[in-house]
Amino acid sequence: AAVGTSNPLMTLAILFINGLCLGAGILVSTAYGAGDTQRVERQVSTTAIAGTVFSLVFSALCVLLATPLLRLMQVPEEILPIAVQYLRIVFAGLIFTFFYNFLAATMRALGDSKSALYFLMISSVLNIGGDLFFVEVLGWGSEGCALSTVLSEALCCVLCVVYIQFKVPVLQLGRRWFVFDGSLLRSTVQYGWTSAMQQATVQLGKIAVQAIVNTLGINAMAAFTAASRVDDFTYMPQQNIAHAMTTLMAQNHGAGKKERVRQGFFCGLRIELIYGFCLMAVCLLFARPIISLFVDDPAVIDLGVKFLRCASLFYLMPGVTNGIQGGFRGLGDLKITLNSSMLNMGFRVAAAAVLVLVLKVDLQIMPVSYGIGWLSMLVYELPLLIRYMKEDKL
């Protein structure tokens, strides 16, 4: 329970850093599509230097604020010390999180999405193996889980650097890694910060919902944590499809190929819808065995199954919203993605608060708040998408 209730804060920090890297990656994609190799090099080195400084400061702040942040989430006092220790170890390793996400985002921006995927798979395998070793063999508990997360990302950073040195000539910068171009810093910060805030807004909404769920008791917390882990895992492909759309569209936007931009958008949107439908079917049919992978208490499993089945009814909606956001990011309009995410989370949290704190509904009805949030997102995004198409921007 301590690890599970800490995950939203850990994910918030990781997604914030990932957002910075994603925003900078859009600039790399655009420059690469335009054939401006020198700008690509300066953009990469400037992002690396600025990101390193930011990550170290951000890491220190997160370590210092771990306890008050967990208290703000209404984490029970009996598990607070364990949760604090877990978070501090993870936060101390955020520099590795930055470099891993930065290098992976840069490779994707250059069109090498396969290598980024392979390194993600390696990181996941190392993390699982580390969990088994530190927790099951050494008996280190939550500290072992945290250490496994940090070490897996550190090892992946090393593997990324080795791979780049042998396989990615564009990124073999040598001393040029230390070139800092102040003229690029403003756009890097603008894109990176907007993207980071968009990612953070989504997670802040989840944390607020988690705090509301925490008022329902330990069983509800455990069931929600299990179902949320499934949610997070299933949303990853949707988000990665959108990221692939962003890279493809940004490269072609930089090269001035409007038709390719349009084709990339609608192809990605179709893939999102197909995946969303398949995901909905799987979670409806196999909710019980899926939830049983994470918890073994029958009462918690029953709650988690009901929650997941209700949530799965809305899975087509994030497929559409993720696809549209990927398109706007590829065109360089990150403000729309930030505004739509803020609307989504605002309506989701408000709906969750009304359902639980006012109407006193059970946990299994909570996903209705997700649907309300995604609907608000679509209502905001669709008119803007239609306008872009009418103005021949897409």
Located regions from the model:
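Short runs within selected transmembrane alpha-helices of multi-pass transporters and secretion channels
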Residues: 21, 25, 89-108, 116-124, ...
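Hydrophobic transmembrane alpha-helices of multi-pass small-molecule transporters
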Residues: 12-15, 127-131, 156-161, 233-236, ...
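Helix-terminus/linker motif at the lipid-water interface of multi-pass membrane proteins
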Residues: 1, 70-77, 133-140, 200-233, ...
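Short alpha-helical transmembrane segments in multi-pass integral membrane proteins
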Residues: 28-93, 137-193, 249-314, 356-394
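Transmembrane helical elements of multi-pass membrane transporters/channels
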Residues: 89, 100, 123, 152-156, ...
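Residue-level hotspots within pore-lining transmembrane alpha-helices
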Residues: 13-17, 57, 61, 91, ...
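Small-residue-rich hydrophobic transmembrane alpha-helices
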Residues: 2-60, 97-116, 223-287, 318-340
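Small-residue hotspots at the loop-to-helix junctions and early N-terminal turns
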Residues: 1-8, 83, 87, 146, ...
